Amino acid sequence: MDEVTVPVTGTPSGQSSELLGHPPDARLLVVNCDDLGMYPAINAAVIESVEEGIASSCSLMVPCPAAPQAMELLSRRPQIPFGIHLTLVREMPDIPWGPLTAKERVASLLDPTGELFPPTPAGRAALLGQARLGEVELEFRAQIDAVADAGLAPTHLDFHCLADGGRDDILDLTVMLAAEYGLAVRVWLEPGRQTMRKRGLPVTDNDFLDSFSLDIEGKAARYAQRLRDLPAGLNEWAVHPSLGDEESQTVDNGWPVRRTDYEFLTSPQAREVLQQEEIVVIDYRTIQQVWSQSMSPR
């Protein structure tokens, strides 16, 4: 694996908003729709949430069955910024997916039955305890290259159900790949964020919001209040919209979370609160520009 030099572009800023050309008191928000490609009702809701709602970017699960449809939708909408939701786990029993790499080449990523681990605490621990970094790299490259082969240009890399990849060496690998491909990385946990800030790279300044952490009852009001309380600096929400239709309810126990996300993201209320609070919604294309300018392979 090639080493990567990540030079500091100057004295690291106290706020990522400054690295992105905004004053330190600006309230910036990335609203990123995760899980694009998992199944068609997610694809439809993500596209609508970006085109008609307040979402600003999305992340594609390349190994999933509806990923080809998602890539076709993205190919017709080059204005939509999207990242690659690097996927090493599978939580949907009724939606089959596995590694893009031949299984015999990534055996350390598989459970005793030859499938991807579930993202349960035990499943994550087993995966992270046995995964060989070289095999993780093979699979990550396969997912990135599949997007490139489709003629698409992603903006960033992030992780499905593994915060910052789950291990320091996996996060380091991902930053190396981002430098090679000219992408940004979503960094969620504070140790990784501190490291990136020291390198002059913009990452979220404040606590990261995963929409699966919110109660469903009263969610719209809770979202609106979070917007009103949004602190200065760069903020990020990882949201998970789906139409919540019959297909969703059949295959996805998390469909109520996804349906309520979709309802808020596309609501007039969401846009009104953003305007009232003078929150600047940005996307990962903006962040990618700073990352790609700041990193160079050695």
Where are these regions (language model features)?
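N-terminal pre-catalytic segment of deacetylase/amide-hydrolase enzymes
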Residues: 1-30
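Active-site gating loops and adjacent loop-to-helix segments of metal-dependent hydrolytic enzymes
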Residues: 95-126
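Structural preference for beta-strand elements that scaffold enzyme active sites
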Residues: 28-30, 55-59, 79-85, 154-158, ...
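Catalytic domains of cell-wall/extracellular-matrix polysaccharide-remodeling enzymes
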Residues: 130-202, 213-217, 228
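Active-site beta-loop-alpha junctions enriched in small/polar residues
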Residues: 34-36, 63, 85-91, 160-162, ...
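Active-site beta->alpha N-cap acidic-glycine motif
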Residues: 20-93
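C-terminal domain-boundary segment and adjacent tail
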Residues: 185-186, 251-298
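Acidic (Asp/Glu)-rich catalytic clusters
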Residues: 21, 46-52, 68-81, 99-104, ...
